[in-house]
């Protein structure tokens, strides 16, 4: 009679899902100077001057522009930092976040 020894089954690794992506959206306003918007985009979102200028113009012409896509926590943090930076200078610049489709 033979006896076979069976080792433990391999542990199943839990599947980790990618965090849901969130868009940071710049909303146009008629009060914040364009140069300041570019400065905020460069400082908070680490854009080049050309990239920031393009985003600013798109928001100006269309009313809004997606700035970047991040995980929820990072998107909300960056949007808050940008709004706070504008508020410190007395500008009503707004950034919002929403889930990416």
Task: Set out the residue ranges of the language-model regions.
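Terminal domain-initiation and capping elements
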Residues: 1-101
């Amino acid at each position: 009679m033979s006896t076979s020894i069976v080792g433990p089954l391999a542990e199943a690794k839990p599947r980790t899902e990618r965090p849901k992506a969130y868009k940071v959206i710049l909303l146009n306003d008629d009060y914040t100077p364009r140069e300041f918007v570019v400065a905020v985009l460069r400082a908070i979102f680490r854009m080049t001057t050309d990239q920031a200028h393009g985003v600013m113009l798109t928001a100006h012409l269309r009313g809004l522009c997606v700035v970047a896509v991040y995980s929820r926590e990072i998107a909300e943090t960056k949007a808050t930092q940008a709004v706070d930076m504008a508020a410190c200078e007395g500008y009503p610049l707004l950034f919002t976040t929403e889930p990416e489709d």
